[in-house]
């Protein structure tokens, strides 16, 4: 499952990233072919790991599943190899998305992290050339800083027309 920059921006305008992750976990669990004997391990994004579990399971159809349990912990990737593997796969998918964006725009966009000088340069170039790219989180503080320095008016907000 991947989430677009637009999905993340819209979540930040609504319930927030924690709820986006809760919904994402729930959707992923709903796709499991078997709902019996499932051991679920999650890296909790909520400050309260148990609440994270409860929110995911609250609307999960037919939960509790037979002989199944869910464990959410902070830094679960350091304790459960399956969570560490999922984290690596997610980072690889993110890297592929960044590479695809670079190929589409025709220049190096860096790693996508705000501390990366190549990412900062790419954001400046994108904002100067065409505004904010669809694959960039518009609500990102780094984007807001560059927009304020190089453009007139407020940073565009997803889902809202500029006047």
Residue map of PLM features:
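RNase H-like, two-metal
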Residues: 1-163
């Amino acid at each position: 499952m991947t989430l677009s920059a637009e999905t993340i921006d819209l979540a930040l305008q609504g319930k927030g990233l924690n709820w986006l992750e809760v919904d994402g976990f729930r959707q992923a669990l709903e796709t499991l072919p078997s709902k019996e004997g499932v051991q679920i391990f999650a890296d909790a994004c909520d400050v309260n790991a148990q609440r994270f579990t409860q929110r995911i399971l609250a609307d999960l159809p037919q939960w509790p599943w037979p002989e199944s349990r869910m464990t959410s912990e902070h830094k679960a990737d350091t304790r459960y190899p399956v969570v560490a593997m999922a984290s690596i796969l997610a980072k690889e998918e993110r890297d592929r998305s960044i590479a695809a964006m670079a190929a589409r725009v025709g220049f190096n966009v860096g790693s996508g992290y705000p501390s990366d000088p190549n990412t900062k340069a790419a954001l400046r170039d994108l904002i100067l050339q065409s505004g904010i790219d669809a694959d960039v989180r518009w609500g990102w503080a780094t984007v807001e800083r560059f927009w304020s320095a190089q453009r007139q008016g407020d940073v565009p907000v997803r889902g809202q027309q500029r006047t």
